[in-house]
Structure formats: C-alpha cells, structure tokens
Design a protein with these regions (language model features):
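Short basic/glycine-enriched coil/helix segment immediately N-terminal to the Walker B
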Residues: 87-91, 172-176, 190-207
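Conserved interdomain linker/interface between the two RecA-like ATPase lobes of SF2 helicase motors
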Residues: 256-338
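Conserved helicase ATPase motor motifs in RecA-like P-loop NTPase domains
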Residues: 97-103, 211-215, 230-253, 271
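SF2 helicase catalytic motif II
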Residues: 185, 198-236, 240
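Inter-Walker segment of RecA-like/P-loop motor cores
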Residues: 149-191
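Conserved Walker A/P-loop ATP-binding site and its immediately adjacent core
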Residues: 108, 121-153, 321-331
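Conserved pre-motif I regulatory segment
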Residues: 13-98
C-alpha cells in the first residue's frame, strides 16, 4: 500500500498544561533565532512540547495517542502494539524531525538545545553527527549563535542555563554545555570525555542526532552501526533523544517516529530553497560504462554552461554519493573521464 507521507507524521498535542511548560517566555527567542521561518518555530515548539510538557512518558504514549485517531496508521500496522514493537528507539522520549536539506536544521538543533537547558529539562546536550566535516560546521554555527548579542537579549530571566559553552568531547562536558561530536569519537578509548561525563547521567542529557537516517539504515561502517547501540546503552540510560534528517526513509519505508515534517516540495513552494532540476537517465547505451560516460558528459556540459552564465560567482558542481567508499570510486571515475 502507498501512503501519503504527511499522514504518517505523529501529531504532538498543542493543548498542554502551561503551568508545566511556559513557552510564551521564549517568543522573542523564537523570533530572533528563526526570523520569519515559521516552520522552524513550529518544529522547535513541537519538539519541546513532546519532551517537556509532561504529556508523554515515551514515544509509545505518543504513538498510542495518534493510533486511535489516524486511519492511515491503523492500515500500516495491525494494532498499536505491532506499531510500538517496530519503533527503533523504544521506551525513550525519542522522535525524528524531517526537515528538507537546506532549510536550517542547525537552527533547530541549537534552538531545541538552548530551550531544553533553559527550562532545566536537562543539564547537558550531546549533538552527534556522522562526520568530522558536519561536526566542524555545526560547532562554527553554534558558536556564532551562542555569542549573538541579539539572541542573548531574548533569553528569559528564568532560564537556568544561558549562552551555552560549545565544546567537543576532548573537553569535560559540564552542566550548561552543548557538546558537538562525530559518532566515531564516541568509541575512541582515549581523548573522549563522553564516558566519564555522561555515564549514569543520561536522564539529564538531551541527545540530538544530526543526519539520523544513518542510524536507522544499514551501513558498512562499524561505528555507524554502533550509533544506535550507544543511544540504547543502559550504562547511559538516555531518556531524551531527537533525530534530524532530510531523508526519513529506511529503504522505501517512511520512519515511524517522525513528529514534524517540512518537505522539499513545501520548501520549494515557499521559496525557502531553490527548485531542483532533475537530469533524466538516458537508456540509449546498454553498457554501464557508456551510461556513466554519458552522465559525466551531461554534468560537465552543464557545469561549463553555468561557468559562462554565472562567471562572477564561480559555480560549483557537487556530486553526492551514498557513502565515503562510493565517493572515492566516483572520484577516480571522474578523474579518468576528465
């Protein structure tokens, strides 16, 4: 059966006890951090309500609440227990935010981290990502946001932790810190403070996972396969876990723990990202080698055209692959072609 993806998104209650969670104090913070990007505000708000309103004990209670009201979910699973058995991170306040690439995931991650620290929901935030490149980019963005005077001025007086220190796991993770690390560092026996800083303290730690589809899908990289095991490790006993991705699919199946979705189509319609022009694959050549050369010719000709048309901005052509090994192979093939 084919489902409409939006129908599979779990809806977070908008009616909750304001005495338990007061987000009105954070309105100015939302406005300065997100500007007019309402979808970012909505995503942060839904995440914080899920984690901090007291309406949910775990992802299971959110599923139960939605399953009763949603016919599409009832068609996807034979009953609510069947649904709950298939959750990837059970018995946690765990969920995924599906945000199209290029729509500002880093703002969401920072916003959720700062509010969770400010509300005293947690003492520390651990942001995990799959590579050094992503780690470096996130740290740089977070340092700018944490040091932004306009953002600082919006933080409520009641906020417990303000202007969090942005560190990596080479430093001891203290209360009020946002630690940004790539998943490989979690398994290094020397140099990483994650074990010492977080063991037995997981219930007071928020774990935010960038590019979370790496956890849910099979990978040839051993450390990536261990990522999920780390999140479920009883030695840490993490309670609050969120994932962020622009590709919330396991093979062709949409993730079953998504609480907010902002699709690429919606982003294009809202002019948040540019329209995507797809190159159709020709079936003229039967040989895989010939097809690859034809594809490279198209890409090269396209690049040359952009160089002429946009000569003042040095156009880049970016080739995206499934993983590092495929990228290395593609690099060699492209060098041979050129």
């Amino acid at each position: 059966k084919i489902y409409k993806t939006q129908d599979l998104v779990l809806q977070v209650k908008q009616n909750y006890n304001p005495a338990k969670l007061n987000l009105k104090k954070w309105v100015d913070f939302f406005d300065v951090l997100c500007g007019d990007r309402e979808f970012q505000k909505e995503a942060i708000r839904d995440a914080i309500i899920f984690l901090a309103s007291g309406e949910y004990n775990s992802i299971e209670s959110l599923v139960e609440d939605n399953f009763r009201k949603n016919d599409e979910l009832q068609k996807r699973y034979k009953d609510v227990r069947d649904y709950q058995r298939n959750l990837p991170l059970p018995h946690k306040l765990s969920a995924v935010i599906d945000l199209a690439t290029g729509t500002g995931k880093s703002y969401l991650i920072y916003g959720i981290a700062q509010i969770a620290l400010g509300l005293d929901l947690v003492d520390k935030v651990l942001v995990l990502c799959p590579s050094l490149t992503i780690e470096s980019g996130l740290k740089e963005k977070f340092e700018k946001l944490s040091g932004d005077d306009k953002i600082k001025a919006t933080l409520p007086d009641s906020a417990v932790f303000k202007n969090p220190r942005i560190i990596d796991a080479n430093s001891t993770i203290k209360n009020g810190d946002i630690c940004v690390e790539n998943i490989h560092a979690v398994y290094e026996r020397t140099g990483s403070s994650i074990n010492d800083s977080l063991k037995k303290n997981g219930e007071r730690v928020l774990v935010l996972n960038d590019e979370v589809h790496h956890i849910y899908n099979s990978s040839s990289e051993q450390d990536i396969r261990k990522w999920k095991a780390f999140l479920l490790n009883p030695d840490f006993n993490f309670k609050y876990i969120l994932g962020f991705t622009g590709t919330a699919y396991m093979d062709d199946e949409y993730f079953n723990d998504v609480i907010y979705r902002y699709s690429i189509r919606q982003a294009v319609n809202d002019k948040v990202v540019k329209s995507v022009d797809y190159v159709a694959e020709d079936e003229v050549s039967s040989s895989p080698t010939e097809r690859k050369r034809e594809k490279f010719h198209k890409i090269y000709d396209n690049h040359e055209e952009f160089v002429k048309r946009y000569r003042l901005i040095k156009p880049l052509t970016i080739l995206v692959t499934k993983d590092i090994s495929k990228a290395k192979t593609l690099r060699e093939d492209l060098i041979d072609f050129l």
